[in-house]
Regions:
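Bacterial N-terminal signal peptides that target proteins for export
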Residues: 1-11
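Sec/Tat signal peptide C-region and signal peptidase I cleavage site
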Residues: 19-24
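Low-complexity, acidic Ser/Thr/Pro/Gly-rich terminal tails and inter-domain linkers that flank the onset
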Residues: 25-59
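Contiguous beta-strand segments within globular domains
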Residues: 51-64, 72-74, 117-118, 131
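Hydrophobic beta-strand positions in extracellular immunoglobulin-like domains
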Residues: 64-66, 81, 157
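Short acidic, flexible loop segments centered on an aromatic residue
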Residues: 74-86
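Acidic Ser/Thr/Pro-rich low-complexity disordered segments
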Residues: 86-101
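Short, solvent-exposed, Trp/other aromatic-anchored flexible loops in extracytoplasmic proteins
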Residues: 97-167, 171-176
Length: 177
């Protein structure tokens, strides 16, 4: 009799799991993300120095691939762009955002994050030249690094509140849920 009771409870559990998954809102679970970083970098010379200041523009282009046979209407892509402070080398989040997407069954779509501009100047020496009584004199002054420099990105893809895929330029970079 004991075996029959265990089988009945097992069957009830299996039935509830089957019915629960059939009746629940379907979540597309076969969505992957591929990230391309659109980037430009402009340099500006610093008067009296061989160093140059840097202005970096970054924008994430995320291609979502739905390999499921059902459309996904509730996809949320969370992204973040990171930089390091040039004076301390400390990692900081420059910008983060969220983009909603709909993906038809067995198809791909692309979403873009916002454009982010990161500016920075490395530590450098500025040399000035003065002429006093017909003699040239050079003086130099050390300038500290300022601003930030691009480090990387992280992207996480959710559907129905479930994490489906995440990718980053460095393994240590993760999106907080």
């Amino acid at each position: 009799m004991k075996n029959k009771v265990n089988w009945t409870w097992g069957a009830a559990l299996a039935w509830s799991m089957l019915c629960g998954s059939v009746l629940a809102e379907p979540v597309a679970r076969h969505i992957t993300a591929k990230v391309e970083v659109e980037n430009t970098t402009d340099y500006k010379n610093i008067a009296g120095s061989t160093a140059r200041s840097k202005e970096q523009t970054r924008q994430l282009n995320v291609t979502l691939d739905n390999r499921d046979k059902q459309a996904a209407n509730d996809v949320v892509v969370k992204w973040a762009i990171y930089a390091h402070k040039m004076e301390t080398n400390k990692l900081v989040t420059v910008k983060e955002g969220t983009v909603k997407a709909k993906i038809e069954a067995l198809s791909t779509t692309s979403v873009k994050g916002e454009k982010v501009i990161i500016k920075g100047t490395p530590k450098h020496t500025v040399v000035t030249r003065k002429t006093t009584n017909g003699k040239a004199q050079n003086s130099s002054k050390n300038e500290a690094a300022t601003g930030e420099e691009y480090y990387g990105y992280a992207v996480a893809v959710y559907a129905g509140g479930v994490l489906l895929d995440e990718t980053s330029s460095h393994p240590s970079l993760k999106i907080e849920k």
